[in-house]
A protein has these predicted regions:
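Short, basic interhelical loop/turn and adjoining N-cap
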Residues: 92-109
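Double-stranded DNA-binding cores of transcription factors and transposases
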Residues: 3, 64-65
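Helix-boundary capping/turn motifs
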Residues: 39-44, 59-64, 87-89
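Short helix-loop boundary/capping segments at the starts of domains
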Residues: 46, 50, 54, 76-79, ...
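A short glycine/serine-rich beta->alpha loop
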Residues: 52-60, 495-497
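Basic, low-complexity segments
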Residues: 1-56
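Alpha-helical support elements that line or immediately flank enzyme active sites
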Residues: 68-78
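Anion-binding and metal-coordination hotspots
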Residues: 80-83, 88, 102, 106, ...
Length: 534
């Protein structure tokens, strides 16, 4: 199948739109389809998807912009692939939105969207490039321009995404991995390797093992499962190294158990080796574990960057990773993707994105990073009044205005300064307790770091009117996780795995951005005004 761009961007003389009555045409142009057809569909860039298709002359592909547009519409209304395809054949609004009113036959069949997604999954698995991400973020940037949103103010937040899996106990996890591999061997006519384990193939065996027995038999069940697992490892050897079920069994045993003198037992806390990336459920090997805000999460995490203006807000960047990915690393990745800003812009985040390294990386891109909260304990405000040289390698003056007698620098790793003053200068200074000055026999000494100096400056900034206005802007991004969960069912995606979850999440971001644009076009938005956005 070869790649061909979709040139059908205008109505033809035989277009089905002309067969509608004037009343029907007016109703169509007042609907969501008008905004989608004029502002979203033409902005879908098909060119990056060229790599998914053959360069040889062959049957042309289904238009990429129709596929991407249909996937976004699917998330807007929360419907299935089949419903999208049926509606495209029967509903003029869908045809108008996707510019297919002039087609003799609608271009989507029952497998079109599935095959398109599969091509994107395979390409990302091989090359590590998410083609949909570039498309959705490009649409977000275009929507921001249509809504007249200045890109100089942005805010950021992260959210947990639940994986589509059951929470398993350790013994259930071991049983499931053994059962899946036994079932694989049975289906592939390898019954000689599973003698005595045929009960794993019984659909009711799971319930018999865990629900129809008393607690006293749990130890015996665990021993039996571990012995069966060892038996499978001995009989299969290296012949099944490429089989997913075998790989998951080996992974589970290496993470959950330990072998002592040829005897396998469960790993304990004293043995160590527990980590958040351990297998949670063989149905989704990519899902990880994280405890956040007193709650346990299994699955993934998403980071959202929202551009804010007087006419509303639009998500202009997002990232989808395993949930043990830190907020600080999300910010670093975002800054790495961001080009240098000709005009200084502001990024407003919470305390999880704070840190001098992040502030320095943002400054390199001409971005002012504002944290509405700071992690760790507060420090004395007096540290903000120490004056450093231009390159930040020497203390020039203390808060009382004294020049130091000497200044020792520990280097770029700890960035601490050991500063000496005349003994009387600190001994008689009213700030000596706040600076934690040490009075020696001949001199006085103070230890101050660049990090503490920057933190004190941030704490001082938090008391200003400008910060309070920025804080109000930051609060708005907290609505995104709620919207994505309630309206777009981000915690109930019908797929498993990091790559598939990332693709579906991108479609949901596209749907949410369209809703924001449609609200703006219809004049239905109510946007709180802020002096920072003026």
């Amino acid at each position: 199948m070869s790649f061909r761009t979709n040139s059908c961007q205008q109505l033809s003389l035989t277009d089905s739109f002309g067969g509608l009555t004037s009343r029907e045409q007016k109703a169509l142009e007042r609907s969501w389809a008008k905004v989608f057809a004029e502002d979203i569909f033409p902005a879908i860039n098909e060119e990056p998807f060229r790599v998914l298709y053959s360069s040889d002359a062959s049957r042309p592909n289904t238009p990429v912009n129709v596929c991407v547009g249909a996937l976004i519409i699917k998330e807007i209304f929360g419907i299935s692939d089949d419903e999208v395809i049926e509606n495209l054949m029967l509903d003029p609004r869908y045809q108008y939105a996707l510019h297919t009113t002039s087609f003799d036959e609608q271009p989507l069949s029952d497998k079109t969207l599935t095959r398109f997604r599969k091509r994107c999954y395979d390409y990302e698995a091989i090359y590590g490039i998410d083609l949909l991400h570039e498309c959705i973020t490009g649409l977000g940037t275009n929507i921001a321009k249509l809504m007249d949103i200045n890109p100089r103010i942005k805010r950021m937040d992260s959210m947990m995404i639940a994986a589509n899996i059951r929470k398993l106990s350790r013994i259930e996890l071991l049983y499931t991995c053994v059962a899946k591999f036994v079932i694989y061997l049975h289906k592939n006519k390898c019954d000689d390797l599973i003698k005595g384990m045929e009960h794993y193939c019984d659909p009711n065996d799971y319930n018999k093992t865990f629900y129809y027995c008393n607690n006293s038999s749990t130890v015996n069940q665990l021993d039996t499962i571990l012995k069966d697992a060892d038996s499978l490892l001995r009989s299969c050897g290296a012949d099944y190294d490429d089989i997913t079920e075998y790989q998951l069994l080996v992974r589970c045993l290496s993470e959950q158990t330990i072998v002592e003198e040829t005897f396998r037992r469960l790993r304990t806390k004293e043995d160590g080796g527990f980590h958040s990336a351990m297998l949670q459920n063989p149905s989704d090997p990519d899902a990880t574990y994280r405890s956040k805000g007193g709650k346990e999460h299994q699955g993934y995490a998403a980071n959202l960057e929202e551009t804010v203006g007087k006419n509303g807000s639009v998500i202009t960047d997002y990232q989808f990773e395993q949930n043990n990915y830190s907020d600080s690393q999300f910010l670093k990745d975002n800054l790495e993707r961001t080009e240098f800003q000709n005009e200084e812009s502001t990024m407003i985040t919470d305390g999880a994105y704070s840190g001098k390294e992040n502030h320095d990386l943002a400054a390199e891109k001409n971005i002012r990073l504002i944290n509405t909260d700071l992690s760790g304990k507060p420090i004395d405000d007096i540290l903000a009044d120490f004056v450093f040289n231009e390159i930040g390698t020497k203390v020039v003056r203390c808060p009382a205005g004294y020049e130091p007698k000497s200044c020792g620098y520990t280097g770029s790793k700890s960035q601490q300064f050991h500063v000496s003053f005349q003994r009387d200068q600190c001994a008689n200074c009213p700030n000596k307790d706040r600076c934690k000055a040490k009075i020696h026999k001949r001199v006085s000494s103070v230890t101050v770091s660049v990090k503490s100096h920057e933190r004190a400056k941030q704490q001082r900034f938090m008391g200003t009117e400008e910060f309070r206005n920025l804080f109000k802007i930051r609060n708005g991004v907290e609505t995104l996780p709620s919207l994505l969960r309630r309206q777009y069912h981000a915690d109930r995606m019908p797929v498993r795995g990091l790559i598939r979850g990332r693709f579906f999440f991108g479609c949901k971001i596209g749907a949410l951005n369209f809703k924001k644009l449609f609200t703006y076009r219809k004049g239905l938005g109510h946007y709180a005004q802020n002096p920072v956005l003026a």
